Each structure stands twice: as structure tokens, then as C-alpha cells.
Amino acid sequence: MEIGLREWLIVIGIIVIAGILFDGWRRMRGSKGKLKFRLDRSFSNLPDEEETTSAEVLGPPRVLDTHKEPQLDEHDLPSMSASPREGKRSNSDKRSDKKRKDEPQQGDLNLDLDGPSLFTGRDDDFPDDKPTQRITEDKDLPPVEEVLVISVISRSEGGFKGPALLQNILESGLRFGEMDIFHRHESMAGNGEVLFSMANAVKPGVFDLDDIDHFSTRAVSFFLGLPGPRHPKQAFDVMVAAARKLAHELDGELKDDQRSVMTAQTIEHYRQRIVEFERRALTQRRG
């Protein structure tokens, strides 16, 4: 049987294809070995994962102080004049300084409280790094005509303990200030006009931050004077919220200015008093 040209071309083609396939297989095998070698060399330069993890675990702890209490800003307290002096600062107020320096100031105080003898004036401790200036009384401010009072009475015979009370009212934005009582300003930092204040309902009516760890009281009183803040209805709502928070968290009971139980009807009556006061003030200005 003779093999023709066609058959020879087929045989040669098969041999060529087989050679190409063999050469490709050989090259592929060699490239895998080189790739593995490169990977081995690359990973050999990386730090050991276990050592890195151990370093993280054994490294120095990083403490995040998430609870920083704002500093006092005694800016513009015309009706509560007192000679400031340098005093001891509580640890909680010292931690607050850095955070509160960035807070914007929001307005001027428009609250004159020359009333109750319960709130006797005296020198105050101002936790401020800058030298304090003597606060002078603004004689142009009108006298307080009405005072809205909400008292919180402790149900416990031991009363409200100083540290817990301080923590609670700081969370509500009150800051220690003039006359050694607490004030709620427009800003949580203690800047801007005073919205309302809180005093110790037990004589002499003040708080001693230097001895707050041993302090306790059976009752505190929140009060808002009229004329006072520019937006008295909103300020009153903030005061109600602060009083309710204290009563809820420290087991207290809300009382009105007659020491009767504070009800929703009483709160609405207070709001109506504010509306009536604003109406009278508007009428007087127009007259």
C-alpha cells in the first residue's frame, strides 16, 4: 500500500500539533514553579500574623474618655453679682475644659433673680483656666415679676446623694455657677443666656462642690424667672424635662410651687401663665 502525499501531510501535521502541545505543557509547568517561587519570596518579607496580633494584644491600652463634663462659663450674669475667687475644682470639671472651649457662645443672660432669701449670694468657685473678672450688675434689667418653680422631692430618707445628683444634672446641661447653684444656659457648654436655675431646696440653698462626695439633700428646686429667657415657653419645656429626668432616675417626686403633686394639668397651667405674661408684656410695650 503506497502512502500518498496527502497521507504524509496528515502525519506531519499530527506530529507538529503534538510537538506544539508538548512544548506548551512544558512551558506552563515551568512558569508555575517560577510563580510559586516569587510568591514564597514575597510572603517571606511580610511580618508574621501571629506576632502582629500578639503585639496588638500586648501593646499599651488606649483609654477613650467618653464622659467629659463641660466647664462653667460665668459670662454675663448681671443679676447674680458676686466676687469670684479661685477655688478647688472637682475632678469632673477638670476633665471638661478641653471639650467645652470649642463650644460657641449663644447669647446674653436676661434673668434677674434678687428674690428668695434662700439663695444667699456668696463667693463662687469658677472652674475656668482664665482669670475671672468681677461681674457687675446691669441696672437696666427689669425685675422678676413671676417665678415658675418645680421641686423634686426624694422618696428616700437619705435624700439625693451628691455624686449621683451632680451626674444627673450635668447630663441635663446644668452648670455650677453664680450663688453656688446650678444654671441651664442656651448651650450645653454653659454659654448663652440662662434659661432656668436649680437650687438646693434645703437651707442654705446652695451646693458645695468641694464636698460633693459627702453631700446629700432631700429636695432640689428648679425655677424660671419672668421676664427671663427670650423664649420662655421653650425654656420651661427644657426645665420640665430636666426635673422629670432627675425624678425618674433618682427616685424623686415632682411638686409645684405649692408643694402639691405636679400633674399634666399643673404643667399646662404653668404654660398658660407664660402666655399671659407675654401678652401683658406685649401690651405694655405697645402702650
UniProtKB/Swiss-Prot annotation:
Periplasmic compartment spans: 1
Stretches assigned to the Cytoplasmic side: 23-287
Transmembrane spans: 2-22
Topology within the bilayer: Single-pass type I membrane protein
Compositional bias segments (type: Basic and acidic residues): 64-77, 85-104, 121-140
Subcellular location: Cell inner membrane
Role summary: Essential cell division protein that stabilizes the FtsZ protofilaments by cross-linking them and that serves as a cytoplasmic membrane anchor for the Z ring. Also required for the recruitment to the septal ring of downstream cell division proteins.
Family: Belongs to the ZipA family.
Protein name: Cell division protein ZipA
Gene: zipA
